[in-house]
């Protein structure tokens, strides 16, 4: 019967769509990258989504984040995302957590419930904890490397973390994961060298923070606020979602 996922079913088949419907995917970080991952997973028919992010929409998010508009500024990102998902697919189950994921909050999450985990968070300590927790639970995970200060969305590719180069975040992750005995990690990364942001104090978040009231981690607390745009983070988020969908459905080109 024709339905909103019929065009997707033409690629992944009825069995693939059933796998997506029965899948539970956790997305950690609902920002410029993770927001587009969530959007694509919802439109692909993933049945259950867990959204983890403690942040509120800031005016400076509107340039790149799909859930950020002038109307949603000040609202929790997970709440905005949940409402949008249910507009796309009213049958979806959405769990939201206003939590900043870190080694200290990791035990709040039971990874054995998940069929796939997406890492779209910014901190190295959080990323490492996510990977370790997924590894212990035997759950597939894919991780986003650096997307800030870059302008070429076509430069991103999927690789194992130990096959990456150029990206400073990937280098740190390689070193730390090796220490922890993690042998593999699927990532999305770019070989494009990061740009140096223009030093303009009139548009500096650190000098003129406009984070909404109630924001837990303001721009003034960050060591550096990277430059961003409307076309790189979305590309990374969509690549992440594509890998999740292909892995969950068992898709192989040519079959």
Give the location of each predicted region.
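Hydrophobic/small residue at the entry helix of a nucleotide-binding pocket
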Residues: 33-34
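Glycine-rich phosphate/adenylate-binding loop
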Residues: 2, 112-113, 121, 126, ...
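N-terminal charged helix/coil linker that caps or initiates catalytic domains
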Residues: 1-26
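Glycine-rich phosphate-binding loop and adjoining beta1-alpha1-beta2 segment
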Residues: 46, 51-89
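Conserved N-terminal Rossmann-fold NAD(P)-binding element of oxidoreductases
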Residues: 27-29, 52
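Conserved SAM/SAH-binding loop
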Residues: 98-106
């Amino acid at each position: 019967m024709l339905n909103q996922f019929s065009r997707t079913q033409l690629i992944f088949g009825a069995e693939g769509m059933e796998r997506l419907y029965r899948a539970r995917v956790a997305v950690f970080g609902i920002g410029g990258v993770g927001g587009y991952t969530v959007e694509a997973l919802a439109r692909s028919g993933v049945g259950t989504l867990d959204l983890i992010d403690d942040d509120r929409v800031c005016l400076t998010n509107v340039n790149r984040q799909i859930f950020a508009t002038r109307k949603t500024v000040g609202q929790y990102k997970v709440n905005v995302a949940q409402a949008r998902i249910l507009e796309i697919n009213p049958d979806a189950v959405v769990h939201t957590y206003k939590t900043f994921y870190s080694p200290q909050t990791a035990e709040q999450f039971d990874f054995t419930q998940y069929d796939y985990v997406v890492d779209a968070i910014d901190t190295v300590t959080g990323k490492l904890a996510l990977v370790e927790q997924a590894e212990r639970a035997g759950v597939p995970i894919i991780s986003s490397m650096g997307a800030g200060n870059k302008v070429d969305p076509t430069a991103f590719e999927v690789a194992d973390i130990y096959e990456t180069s150029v990206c400073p975040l990937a280098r740190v992750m390689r070193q730390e994961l090796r220490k922890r005995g993690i042998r593999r990690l699927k990532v999305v990364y770019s070989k494009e060298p990061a740009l140096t942001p223009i030093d303009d104090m009139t548009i500096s978040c650190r000098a003129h923070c406009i984070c909404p009231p109630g924001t837990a981690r303001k721009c003034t607390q960050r060591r550096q606020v990277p430059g961003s745009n409307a076309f790189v983070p979305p590309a990374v988020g969509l690549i992440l979602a594509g890998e999740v969908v292909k892995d969950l459905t068992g898709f192989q080109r040519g079959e």
